[in-house]
């Protein structure tokens, strides 16, 4: 009883003094918190820079569609969109057979998380430059070729590969070959052998032959009945919508068409990266003629203002998106009987809703023809087949379908490729053709960017880049005039015009600062001089003793016609930025002299510099000149190095593998 009374007393005491107790508690708690000892420093595990091979192997789950069927992924790596076009052909044939498929840009694919779980993958990949992956395949390629990937990373993933290359390049289809090899090394299962196409000869035919043999094997592997894919009728993936000023479908004003938003890549410091998919619009600062009035050709020096948004290094390439000739565009508009000012968009056939994202556009038909469609290059066989469906004239249809067959390769090459017949030419030659504009916009290849060797150093003029462009125009065997799309357009640019462009990194570089005492030998006739102009500007900026150990071989027709940048070169020579300047004139006398001849004339000097570890550079025509230069170099190595053919070639191969023999060539 006393205990209970004591408890009651304490309870009353606490209640009567609760406010004071709380205040005291807060004061004490605050004091203890403010005066608590500091916590011990956190303990961090030592970072492991090596790849965790076990962590790379996420749980394997086979990719399936909504119906539970395995999905084929068709990956493309492209610089000119040809590989993407080929992937769409595979997609069309998949649908005919009944195979669920998805075409995927390698740049947007989450390869680390998804590749291990794919049920079947097909790679259609191009090789760009000197054995390099295309811009959109670079990240995937670097990931796949990392030597520390576990050998069972892609265990059992079925795959096949088709490569797009050019046999005139040294590293023919290198990217496709590496991807094919690495997929197998990492545990993938090769279902069908790798195919390779040669863009210098029969790329489209090579692709058609490969897929014809590929389908029976792949269908058997996936468990599908092989159905004929020989029916080459055009199957549209998009429908065209004509829009009003508010981008609403004029046939259904309740539907709004919007462009697909671009998500530009950002650098580590959150700056926008300008590339092929997101070009920078640069202002033209200068556009001047480099040839004399005596020349029957034209070569332009063009400078662009980059500002702080875009950077480059000496030897890089500049990609430029050209615009088709306006007269040709108007001719096409008239021939197809359309209104060039109509605002249109292409949207997926199966896409519905009040707001639809366009796959192409919105834009006017005139702009589509001007900036996006390749209307001048030789027509592909797939386009011939699509055009053939648009005529009621049986003779025209028969002729076009025949030209698209493998049996007609020789005639196709003679009539289409060698004569440079574009789609506008065919529409004029076959008056019965009347393709639907929606189909025409879809099956006509896109106008690719043109790549130019940069002819300046960023240290010469801050925020300025230059290119050197010879204007392409010639007459074919059938006396048909052909003008290069990009070079002609570039030649007409005025100061202040804006040009969509981007920088592409190149391996064509001067020796690094650590090895800059090594001599350099440069061989570049015609516009092959372009990167070497940048090299000389860079050497002048460095201002080191390497200047005395540089040798340039330049070639042109004569000193009064097309000796481009002559004053600059002579000034570099006089100021010792350039050690030796050797010029070959092919039309000055009855005896034609080329850069390879001059190499042999100066063979002692060339060998002396090679013995000092010289870097050897070749830029220009890859079909004839670069091969002739290499033959001259082989001759010098055999003579002064006392080597036979094989060991002389091995000498050059060793230079190449160590980055001392570099080529920047085109065809």
Swiss-Prot record:
Q: Which residues form a coiled coil?
A: none
Which superkingdom is the protein from? Eukaryota
Q: Which InterPro entries match?
A: CysJ-like_FAD-binding, FAD-bd_FR_type, Flavdoxin-like, Flavodoxin/NO_synth, Flavoprot_Pyr_Nucl_cyt_Rdtase, Flavoprotein-like_sf, FNR_nucleotide-bd, NADPH_Cyt_P450_Rdtase_alpha
Q: Name one GO molecular function term.
A: NADPH-hemoprotein reductase activity
Tell me the enzyme class: oxidoreductase
Primary location: endoplasmic reticulum
Its Enzyme Commission number? 1.6.2.4
Q: Which UniProt keywords apply?
A: Endoplasmic reticulum, FAD, Flavoprotein, FMN, Membrane, NADP, Oxidoreductase, Transmembrane, Transmembrane helix
The record places the following residue ranges in the Cytoplasmic compartment, namely 30-667
The record ties this protein, via PROSITE patterns, to: FAD_FR, FLAVODOXIN_LIKE
Q: Does the keyword Transmembrane apply?
A: yes
Q: Ranges in the Lumenal compartment? A: 1-8
Q: How does it sit in the membrane?
A: Single-pass membrane protein
Residues recorded as binding NADP(+), renumbered to this chain, are: 297, 527, 586-587, 592-596
Identify the GO cellular component terms for this protein.
cytosol; endoplasmic reticulum membrane
Concerning Gene3D superfamilies, the annotation shows: 3.40.50.360, NADPH-cytochrome p450 Reductase, Chain A, domain 3 (1.20.990.10), Nucleotide-binding domain of ferredoxin-NADP reductase (FNR) module (3.40.50.80), Translation factors (2.40.30.10)
Q: Which residues cross the membrane?
A: 9-29
> Binding positions for FMN?
164-173, 199
**Assigned protein family:** Belongs to the NADPH--cytochrome P450 reductase family. In the N-terminal section; belongs to the flavodoxin family.
This protein's name: NADPH--cytochrome P450 reductase
What species is this protein from?
A: Dictyostelium discoideum
**Organism placement in taxonomy:** Eukaryota, Amoebozoa, Evosea, Eumycetozoa, Dictyostelia
